[in-house]
Design a protein with these regions (language model features):
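P-loop NTPase motor core of the ASCE superfamily
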Residues: 3, 78-81, 117, 128-200
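Conserved P-loop NTPase motor cores
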Residues: 1-26, 31-32, 36-144
Length: 200
């Protein structure tokens, strides 16, 4: 996503902060590889703190990526504040990478409701998740996400990581009929050929 940020995001970021789990601080080979690819990437271990990172002083657009700390995020007042306050007033975007979207937690529901885009990867071992999310987002089309993945599986078998972007942003430039899409990155020829799944 960072590699093709100009195709994915509508603004450039003055700073990008990548937050790794504190448990891997002793073995940071992965983070070192990231720094080699993205030299300007700021890497920290654990959850972010807006004041400690001095993100309030920079009025330009900033991005925080929190990787593999979803359970901690849904219990964190700091993450809650980033979603509900700082993202609106401090020009901060945040990406949470997790494995259990419906985890029961103190702030999980609020984080979900304040998430403007969800990227869902196909997991054939958990079809119930797709059904639950479809019913929550598209109550009149409870099979829309499963049908979209079935289309990708049938027509793009060579793509290992099949994903859907569900755009629920109120400021999205696309109409509601295009809120579910895939293939958002450029292909080998440099052209982006998105696929849309209108919930009709």
């Amino acid at each position: 996503m960072l590699k093709y940020s100009k195709f994915v995001f509508d603004k450039d970021f003055s700073r990008i902060v990548y937050c790794c789990p504190s448990e891997i601080s002793h073995n940071n080979h992965y983070c070192s590889e990231l720094k080699n690819i993205f030299p300007n990437l700021e890497i920290i271990y654990g959850l972010p703190n807006v004041d400690a990172l001095q993100l309030r002083t920079d009025k330009n657009h900033k991005l925080i990526i929190v990787d593999d700390q979803f359970d901690s995020c849904t219990q964190s007042k700091e993450i809650y504040d980033i979603f509900t306050i700082h993202s609106h007033h401090e020009n901060i975007s945040i990406i949470l990478i997790g494995h259990n979207f419906f985890t029961r937690s103190k702030y999980g529901t609020t984080l979900s409701r304040n998430t403007t885009a969800k990227i869902i990867f196909y997991d054939k071992a958990d079809q119930l998740f797709l059904s639950l999310l479809s019913r929550r987002l598209f109550p009149s089309h409870p099979k829309i996400l499963s049908e979209a993945f079935s289309f990708l599986i049938e027509n793009f078998p060579e793509n290992y990581a099949k994903y859907l972007v569900v755009d629920t942003s109120p400021s999205s430039y696309l109409p509601q009929s295009f809120m579910i899409r895939s293939n958002i990155f450029p292909e080998k020829d440099g052209v982006v050929r998105p696929i849309f799944f209108p919930p009709n």
